Every structure is written in structure tokens, then in C-alpha cells.
From Swiss-Prot:
It is found in: Virion membrane. Residues 22-140 are virion surface. This is Envelope protein A28 homolog. It comes from Myxoma virus (strain Lausanne). The chain crosses the membrane at residues 1-21. GO terms for cellular component: membrane; viral envelope; virion membrane. Contains two intramolecular disulfide bonds. They are created by the viral disulfide bond formation pathway, a poxvirus-specific pathway that operates on the cytoplasmic side of the MV membranes. Keywords: Disulfide bond, Fusion of virus membrane with host membrane, Late protein, Membrane, Signal-anchor, Transmembrane, Transmembrane helix, Viral envelope protein, Viral penetration into host cytoplasm, Virion, Virus entry into host cell. Disulfide bonds: none annotated. The lineage of its organism: Viruses, Varidnaviria, Bamfordvirae, Nucleocytoviricota, Pokkesviricetes.
Length: 140
């Protein structure tokens, strides 16, 4: 074999070994990776340090907001999902807009709704001690 062939064989061998080391490292830390993902999943749609944001479209409700409490997110409330931020809940005209699935909430919040009503149960004339207000404060 000539020196060029030996060089390329060594480079390919090193590359394959590096890939195998990475796969083995992921295998060893898989439980830690799952725990990290579970812990940081509420921040999935927030722009935070070292956390990437997932955009469902080119422009969404969180693109121009840098305060994490002001960002819209989907949270399970009772047996349904609601879209909330520190401004309140996305409303359907009468009350809080509820979704049966998390994907339905995400699709509406980050794709469908650009201008929708917002209901804040913590400001008058609403009761600041209501269940909805308490949940809103605890979710933020």
C-alpha cells in the first residue's frame, strides 16, 4: 500500500471509532438524557440560555418576547390543555380555550392563533383567589 492509502485508512478508522465512542457514551448516559429532557420539557417553547426553541412557523407568538414568564406555553389543567402566559389564558370568547391534546394546544398557540382574546382571571372583576388564577400563578 502506498502512503496515501494508509493515511485514508487511518482517517476512516479514527472517524468510525469516534462515532462508536459517541454512540457508547449516549448508551451509558441514556437515563440521564431522558431525565434532562423530562426536566426541561416545560421550557421547550421558551427562549432560554442553552435551550433551543421549536418554532411551528416562521413567526409565532414567542418570537419577540424575551421574558420567560411572558412566553406562551401549553400546560395541562384539569383534564385538558390550556395556553397561558403571564398575561393570562388564550380565550375562546366566553372562557378559557381548552384543548383535548397537547398537539392541538401547540398547533393553535404557535400556528393558528395570531390574534386571539386573552382572559386573565387574576385581575378585577375576576376573583384573584379563583382556581384559574391560582393555577396561572403556579404554572409561571
Amino acid at each position: 500500500m502506498n502512503p496515501v492509502t494508509v493515511f485514508f485508512v487511518v482517517v476512516v478508522t479514527v472517524a468510525v471509532c469516534m462515532i462508536l465512542f459517541q454512540v457508547y457514551s449516549i448508551y451509558l448516559n441514556y437515563d440521564n438524557i431522558k431525565e434532562f429532557n423530562a426536566m426541561h420539557s416545560p421550557l421547550e417553547y421558551s427562549k432560554m440560555v442553552n435551550v433551543t426553541a421549536i418554532d411551528r412557523r416562521v413567526q409565532d407568538a414567542n418570537d419577540d418576547i424575551y421574558d420567560a414568564k411572558q412566553k406562551w406555553r401549553c400546560v395541562k389543567f384539569d383534564d385538558s390543555y390550556v395556553s397561558l402566559s403571564m398575561f393570562g389564558y388564550k380565550a375562546d370568547g366566553v372562557g378559557i380555550r381548552r384543548f383535548r391534546t397537547l398537539n392541538g394546544c401547540i398547533d393553535y398557540t404557535f400556528s393558528t392563533s395570531t390574534h386571539s382574546s386573552i382572559l386573565n382571571p387574576c385581575i378585577p372583576p375576576n376573583d384573584p383567589k379563583s382556581r384559574e388564577c391560582t393555577f396561572l400563578k403556579s404554572a409561571l
